[in-house]
Amino acid sequence: MNFKQFLIESSIFKNFDGKKVIVAYKLFNMIDGKLYPLYVNAKKEIPLHKWIDAEIGPVISDGKNKGKIKTNGKLGGSVALRPGWHAGDHPVATHIGEPAVPKGKPAYRRDSEVWTEVYITAEIDYQDQANKNGTNKQGKIIKKNADLDYIPKNGYYRYKTNSNMLGDWIIGGSMYVNRILTDDEVEKINKLDSEKDGIVYKDLPRRPR
């Protein structure tokens, strides 16, 4: 089986380990050969080849960020209460990375950041509930509001921060990290997806040395 055929056969849904899963991509920090989340529970190692249930991080109880989740990654701060494993349907995250100049926009993929191929449980599709939460009084779905404030146990839903976002976030209740991708594999996957969808998917490059 060539690389392109492998992608076609594994890019949507498949049965794995007795579960219905969706294949997705997740960015991690790699420190001393071990994987760690970028933001929430960033000090907790994530093993390869093992199912891990999502957990809700520490919720901020007061102040201007009350109700958000406290992060302990490189940047600190907080994120919205949107529990679950966050992955994407393409290995692209141009909003995360190292700026070329102080306080600039992300321009480079950090040396410690690696893409992985992950499986997200897909036994239950929570999309209808997420869309219901994001529907306004006029019946229009506001995508940035179409989420859940609880972990989608045994399932997943798709989420967009805005309509211009490339691809979707896939938010799931359980995750299995299947393998770490090389930069060449990331480039090949995005190139093939670009040809298939007619959209240019391109992740940030590494900083030139």
Please provide the spans of the model-predicted regions.
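Extended catalytic/binding region for NAD+/ADP-ribose chemistry, centered on the ART fold
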Residues: K74-A100
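Short low-polarity hydrophobic stretches
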Residues: F3, A87-G88, T182
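Active-site and NAD+-binding cores of ADP-ribose-processing enzymes
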Residues: I12-K68, T94, G104-R209
